[in-house]
Structures are given as structure tokens and as C-alpha cells.
Design a protein with these regions (language model features):
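Hydrophobic alpha-helical segments
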Residues: 1-226
Length: 226
């Protein structure tokens, strides 16, 4: 016999079915639950159903979440990258989980404001053709694209060269999917700033207690106030 659920219960069931867990992000806005359901629609368009590879999207989400003063997003999305009982990368049950070591390397990368950006721009600008595939995790191309993405994300009014380099590497159509993902990540960050009551889930507290270096990189980042 089919059990009828209230609309919001149906919504939470849908979210949990996609991520493998129910993130507290999608349990916020209790006073206007219909609003968070609309935000879920944007999450699907810009992030979950975006045709970029799942691990690439999730690593991009984690990387850009370094620059958000609220720590909820970086912690939760690292959980998604790690998989298992922490959820699924970009809601993809087929995504291969990353290791703690891979995540730590990502978090240790210098930001654009801690490095010389010229080589990053040149690497993308000198490509002789649009990339046929999205970069592999931990590759030089991913590093360059993420560095340019950070400039575009944090300083959009001063990011013309970064944007042009990304368009050159990706082509116009894939750049739009890339920028759509950035737009949702920005929205998610702003939402957590407006809802500081959103708490990190228990699974991530347990993980951080067992991995002190990872916890430090997540919670104590000098780039968080960008």
C-alpha cells in the first residue's frame, strides 16, 4: 500500500534519495519550505544535473568553498567527495569516492592570491584546441582551471583574463555549464551566510575527530574571508 507523504516530506525523501543523506542545508528555511524547494530546482540545474563530471563538480565545489566564511559547505561537500556514509559526489551513486589524501592535496593548493597566476593563464591560453574532455582530478589543467575559477568567483569585476582563458579552454557551451555551477555554489554560500544556524551533520563531526589535519584545513583557512 502506498503511503502518502506531506509535500515537504516528499521533498526531503527526494533530496535524501539523490545524495544518500539529507543535508541540513535542505532542512533550512522552515518558515517558508516552498522556498528551499525552489532552491533545490537550481541545485539540480546548476550542480546535480549539470553535465560536467561528478567528481570534477564536487572538487570544484570544495575548492571554491574555501573562500566562504561559513564552513558548512566545505565540510559537507568534502563528505560528498569521500562518499560512503557521507553521501554522494554531486548526487551521483556511480561516482568513485576520493581518498582523504586526495582531498588534503586539494585543500593545500595555493590560492590565486598566494601564487603567481601568469603560468595558470598561459597554460589555458596556449591550448591549440578546445579541450575534448574535462580535466582529470589533480592534473595541471584542473589546477589551472580551478585557479581561474577562484578569480572569477571571488573577483568577478577583475576577472576578464581568467574568464577568457576558461572560455578558450572549454569553448562557449561548456563554459556556460561551468559558470552555471559557479552560480549555484555562490548561491549556496550566501544561503549559509544568511542561515548561520545550519549545523554540520554528525557524520562529519565524527570524521573530523578522527582526522585532525583534514579538520584543520577545513575549519582554519586563511582564505575563508575572501
Amino acid at each position: 500500500m502506498k503511503i502518502d507523504l506531506a509535500p515537504h516530506e516528499e521533498f526531503e525523501k527526494e533530496v535524501a534519495g539523490r545524495f544518500g543523506i539529507l543535508p541540513n542545508f535542505f532542512r533550512s528555511s522552515q518558515a517558508a519550505p516552498e522556498l528551499i524547494q525552489q532552491l533545490w530546482g537550481f541545485a539540480n540545474a546548476g550542480y546535480l544535473d549539470n553535465p560536467m563530471p561528478s567528481i570534477f563538480k564536487e572538487r570544484l565545489f570544495v575548492w571554491l568553498s574555501r573562500f566562504c566564511p561559513m564552513r558548512y559547505c566545505i565540510v559537507r561537500h568534502i563528505g560528498f567527495l569521500l562518499g560512503g556514509n557521507h553521501g554522494r559526489a554531486a548526487g551521483d551513486s556511480a561516482a568513485v569516492p576520493q581518498s582523504i589524501e586526495e582531498v588534503v592535496r586539494l585543500l593545500r593548493r595555493p590560492s590565486p592570491w598566494q601564487r603567481e597566476m601568469e603560468p595558470m593563464y598561459v597554460l589555458l591560453e596556449r591550448l591549440t584546441a578546445t579541450l575534448e574532455a574535462w580535466p582529470h582530478a589533480d592534473s595541471e589543467l584542473e589546477d589551472a582551471m580551478f585557479a581561474c575559477a577562484a578569480v572569477l568567483f571571488v573577483e568577478p569585476a577583475r576577472s576578464e583574463r581568467a574568464k577568457d582563458a576558461l572560455i578558450h579552454a572549454l569553448g562557449a557551451r561548456r563554459f556556460e555549464f561551468f559558470s552555471g555551477c559557479l552560480a549555484f555554489i555562490r548561491t549556496a554560500h550566501y544561503w549559509t551566510m544568511l542561515h548561520p544556524e545550519i549545523q554540520t551533520e554528525d557524520d562529519m563531526h565524527v570524521l573530523m575527530r578522527g582526522h585532525e589535519e583534514l579538520a584543520r584545513l577545513m575549519l582554519d583557512d586563511s582564505e575563508a574571508d575572501r
